[in-house]
């Protein structure tokens, strides 16, 4: 919400006018969802880094087969870029190519090795910080201020609290009750909200536990309701694997509808304003759906991990914060969570846990990118 999309459009416009259009630029992102979001925001076709480099599954980025022959490469969501991915990009661009990385170094680190964005900033690579927040609602004063100031804060007492950024105080034992009551009411009302959790399993407010409970509260099983495995007609689901046949990406959230009787049951996924349909019984019998295409891989999405939410936006987010999961509460995780919200953040738990998260900085990754680059600058072997 800081004007990044406008900046991308301006950069591309400048290059369009200065070089031949066929070799002007490539827009890319680390994931399919991020690439599609970039395309939708700018109206300019974007690709995954994997696709731009011609990387095949399970291969190393340095073994990519495609050269990028443009004068400009713009990579969005650069906090997700691993050291190997960056090496693949730099290994396959022309010597006179400009590489522009856009991202937030305060968000979660990449899944792969390295801390690329922060390391490049330490090396003094030319950079611009967009500090003004525009995405948050004008009425969400505290949320807007907290998102902008969070990287510089160290104590929950420095946060601004109002109706747009609030804490529902609760003991760990009743966090699931309070959170699910609030979330279920909002889901049933059709609000654009998302429950986020720092943990996937093992606690009462893990993604697994919250999904089971919220499914029962928001979409209870009845004698008339159709099911498919753990899914029920009307469930909120997330796509967990890119599927080119259905043009959906890992991270897409939609609603699953199940209709018909055996052997003619049909599943329809409503996602991003389109409908994706397949024959359930064909999948169960043959392992494939329409035209032998694999069906979408799905999971319940009433609750998601903060990692899964990266790159997405919601009007409101609800998140449990408890000392019971203190080992998983990090500064960049909490920051990533609150920056997913455009209007409202509701934390359910206690201030001690919020404070712990704000003061807990992940152990630094030893990628040696900074040290080796500095040695090369001095003319020494890295």
Spans of model-derived segments:
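Active-site lining segments that contact anionic ligands and/or coordinate catalytic metals
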Residues: 2, 22, 70, 96, ...
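ASCE P-loop NTPase helicase motor core
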Residues: 2-161
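Structural motif
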Residues: 28, 72-76, 100, 194-196, ...
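Short, charged/polar "capping" segments at the starts of alpha-helices
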Residues: 35-36, 109, 203-205, 353-357
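Short, solvent-exposed amphipathic alpha-helical segments in soluble enzyme
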Residues: 43-44, 89-92, 210-215, 333-337, ...
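Residue-level recognition of short, solvent-exposed, well-ordered loop/turn junctions
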Residues: 68, 94, 230-233, 249, ...
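Conserved helicase motor core of P-loop NTPases
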Residues: 105-249, 254-263
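C-terminal accessory regions
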Residues: 252-382
């Amino acid at each position: 919400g800081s004007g990044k999309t406008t900046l991308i459009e301006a950069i591309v416009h400048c290059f369009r006018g200065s070089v031949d259009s066929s070799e002007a630029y490539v827009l890319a992102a680390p994931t399919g969802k991020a690439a599609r979001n970039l395309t939708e925001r700018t109206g300019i076709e974007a690709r995954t880094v994997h696709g731009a480099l011609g990387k095949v599954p399970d291969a190393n980025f340095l073994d990519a087969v495609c050269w990028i022959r443009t004068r400009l490469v713009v990579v969005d969501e650069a906090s997700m870029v691993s050291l190997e991915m960056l090496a693949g990009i730099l290994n396959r661009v022309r010597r006179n190519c400009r590489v522009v990385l856009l991202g937030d170094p305060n968000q979660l680190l990449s899944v792969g090795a390295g801390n690329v964005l922060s390391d490049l900033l330490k090396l003094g690579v030319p950079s611009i910080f967009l500090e003004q927040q525009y995405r948050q609602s004008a009425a969400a004063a505290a949320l807007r201020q907290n998102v902008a100031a969070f990287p510089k804060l160290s104590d929950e007492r420095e946060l601004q609290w109002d109706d747009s950024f609030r804490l529902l105080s609760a003991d760990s034992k009743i966090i699931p009750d309070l959170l699910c009551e609030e979330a279920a009411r909002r889901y049933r009302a059709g609000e654009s909200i998302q429950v986020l959790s720092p943990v996937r399993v093992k606690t009462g407010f893990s993604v697994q536990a919250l999904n089971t409970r919220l499914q029962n509260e928001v979409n209870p099983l009845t004698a008339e309701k159709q099911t498919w495995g753990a899914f029920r007609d009307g469930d909120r689901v997330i796509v967990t694997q890119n599927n080119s046949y259905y043009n959906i990406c890992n991270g897409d959230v939609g609603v699953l509808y199940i209709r018909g009787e055996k052997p003619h049951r049909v599943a329809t996924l409503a996602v991003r304003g389109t409908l994706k349909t397949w024959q359930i019984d064909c999948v169960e019998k043959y392992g494939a759906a329409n035209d032998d295409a694999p069906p979408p891989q799905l999971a319940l999405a009433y609750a998601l991990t903060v990692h899964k939410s990266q790159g997405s936006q919601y009007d409101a987010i609800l998140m449990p914060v408890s000392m019971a999961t203190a080992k998983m509460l990090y500064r960049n995780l909490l920051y990533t969570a609150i920056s997913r919200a455009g209007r409202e953040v509701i934390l359910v738990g206690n201030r001690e846990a919020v404070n712990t998260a704000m003061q807990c900085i992940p152990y630094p990754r030893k990628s040696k990118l900074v040290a080796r680059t500095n040695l090369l600058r001095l003319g020494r072997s890295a």
